Design a protein with these regions (language model features):
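Structural signature of Gram-negative outer-membrane beta-barrels, strongest in the C-terminal barrel
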Residues: 1-47, 95, 105, 150, ...
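Surface-exposed extracellular loop regions of Gram-negative outer-membrane beta-barrel proteins
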Residues: 1-23, 43-74, 172-184
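Short, low-complexity, polar/charged sequence segments that are solvent-exposed and flexible
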Residues: 34-37, 56-60, 120-123, 176
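Gram-negative outer-membrane beta-barrel transporters
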Residues: 43-45, 69-182
Length: 185
């Protein structure tokens, strides 16, 4: 993410900083002849991340507010994220051939601070003008991160035949997934 659009120009991402990640997790593991369990708590803080996305926009960066289309790079810098939660995994050998498994995860994946937004307009760069437009602060603090469920669970049964074949089935539950938002609106 060092260049806003490396295919088109040599514009370096403004206010670029090294991303830092701080993580910790702790687990408790139980192993018995027929039963296995694992409980894990986790925490992760990501600071100064950069995300670049591309789209066509009307009137972005133009002084006259025209409706011409232009291809822009949306550059969001200074993104801070916080991920924390717990996971549980269980396995029970019901018989010598049948095993039950269960897993669950509950987490909170949020943006922990606001970020900065700029766009890189390829049409302005082609004309030799400054391609960057500063849109200021993006108010994303406490918004949930997109693309992952905050809650997940799974239950499964497995049959292992003594003649070296097996079959299994799982039922999954996913909840509290959030879609991505438009930073520029």
């Amino acid at each position: 993410n060092s260049f806003s659009n490396a295919r088109m120009n040599n514009v370096i991402t403004p206010e670029l900083q090294s991303e830092s990640i701080t993580s910790a997790d702790a687990s408790y593991i139980l192993r018995a002849p027929k039963f296995k369990a694992r409980l894990t708590g986790f925490y992760s803080k990501i600071q100064d991340a950069t995300e670049i996305s591309f789209f066509y926009g009307e009137g972005i960066g133009s002084d006259d507010g025209g409706d011409e289309d232009t291809f822009v790079s949306e550059i969001v810098t200074g993104i801070d994220k916080q991920n924390m939660g717990a996971e549980l995994g269980l396995e029970y050998q019901i018989t010598s051939t049948i095993k039950a498994t269960a897993a669950a995860s509950y987490g909170q994946y949020i943006y922990s601070d606001n970020a900065k937004l700029k766009t890189n307009d390829d049409a302005l760069a082609a004309e030799g003008n400054s391609p960057l437009t500063d849109f200021g602060t993006v108010y994303i603090k406490d918004y949930h991160q997109p693309g992952m469920p905050q809650t997940a669970a799974s239950f499964g049964l497995e049959y292992r035949d003594p003649h070296f074949w097996w079959v299994g089935a799982n039922v999954n539950y996913l909840a509290n997934s959030y879609i991505d938002f438009a930073n520029i609106l």
